[in-house]
Amino acid sequence: MKSAGAIQKNTEKRASHDVLFSLCENAADKLILLVLLGSVLLFILWPIACIALRSLRGADGGVSFAMFGTVLRQYGESLRNSVFVGVFTAVLSTILSLSAALVCATARGWKKTLCMVIMLVAMVSPPFVSSLAYIQLYGRRGWITYRLLHLSLNPYNRWGVILMQSISFVPLNAMFLSGILEKLDEGSLRSARDLGASGGAILRDIVLPLIRPATLVCLLLSFVRSLADFGTPIIIGGRFSTLAADIYLQVVGYSDLEKSSAMNMFLLIPSIVFFFVYRALMRRSDRLTDASRTAQTELGLSLPHCGAMGWGMIALSTVFFVMIVLQYGCVFLSGFLKSTKGVYSFTLQYWDQLWRIGSSTMLRSVEYALIVSIAGTVFAMLFAYYMDRRRIIGRSLFDCLATLPYMLPGTCFGIGYILAFNHAPLKLTGTALIVLANMLFKQLPTSTKICTASLALLPEVQERSARDLGAGRLAVLRDVVFPALRPAFLSCFVYNFTSSMTTAGSIIFLIDAKRQLAVFKLFDAVYQGDYALASLIASVITVIVLFVEGLAFLITRKGENRRVSRT
């Protein structure tokens, strides 16, 4: 038997080891928090500050507002055009989004599935697809305008920009509104019916007022996205120019960062103002839908029984869904069709062309998307946990900063990175790291929201119980929090992968010529009029994203079935 001295010595040794391990764990915990907060300040706040500082720099190096006057004189018309397009696009896309969301929320069976599939495909498709399909369907030699209706119309104008932007913004807005509609209290709708209210009265007096804050959110988001969109005006705007398009041309053509920064301030300031309005509206929307947090399979309302308003929404959503089907049908077919004297035939020549010039680009896009998906998801999980559960000092400020990129125009975020990381001690321009960082932090707001929603389902008492049993902070994070966030990990991974494969605005100024991505090959092909190759690139990107989403769905379904079988 061991002597009492030996036992005491082993106990003291074990105690000292535990103390040392606890100190190391606490140090690692604080280091993780420091890295998270420092990264938000460095990669979100600092680029925005660099834009503001550069726009105020005068010729003598001092503070000057002269560049703003120059921008107003030279680009005042473009600014007015941006506001004009933004207002019309916001209104039209919100009306279409509301109609499509109500149709999806009230549909049953295969109709609901069909609507959701169409919107899913539209959501995961790369940018510029709407412009590409618009030219092929409604251009001077378009399939519908010229070949079917024998018309030769000029599609390159402001109304084409408004129409294409509106259609592009509808899927995301409609999915957001569908989620809000599914959380409405079914009891209030039943009570209204029991009191004799008609379907139209329920829609007008109960449903629409409850989702008014969410509808205003869609209006604001559509306006900001329209302001930030440079691709659509460049491709189909013709002589009609917007401020975002002029910023792109100013940076790419003249590399005038002072003027570009001042131009970006006219987009940045309203975006930040709308950001705070957006947060207030989201809080109000959460309060209005708090009565029923469990999502319903369908909204207990029939649009055909809602009178003229219901039929109007059905008609609008039908037009939208038909246009989406035509749009993507055109894009998928164009990559495999060749026109010879007006006669179309099947061909693989564009596939061979894509394989020769774009295979490495496509692989690089997938590689970048996978890196951002994994790193961005882990970062979002950690950030959501420390903000939601640790309640650190300045939590509201850092949460606000982390959400800010959601409302920032992509050109602002991209130019901010050029200004912030173009010199020592942190020179990142020309490297893959600056592109990956920009993608990660541009997508951080949505990823953090997903993780925060999953954390809300984890009772804090489980964490406290683990701490009471002697587990350290990192042990709680590893053994309690991360397992509970597995569904959120998969959702964030899919979102980050999809966004990384289809993003363009914020990284267009950061891409090195030797490290091209597929989405910019798509933009170049559309801009140069090579529509068949552009259609094939868009189709391949869409198929890759849908494959990853389908794989994630199967993994989720398998995990759910395994949990059910265990219970």
Which residue stretches match the model-derived regions?
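Transmembrane alpha-helical segments of polytopic membrane transport and secretion proteins
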Residues: 1-35, 280-318, 554-567
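Membrane-water interface segments at the C-terminal ends of transmembrane alpha-helices
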Residues: 28-59, 71-182, 210-231, 262-280, ...
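Glycine/proline-centered hinge or cleavage motifs at structural transition points of membrane proteins
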Residues: 195-197, 209, 469-471, 483
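Glycine-rich helix-loop "coupling/hinge" segments at transmembrane-helix boundaries
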Residues: 230-254, 339-343, 504-531, 565-567
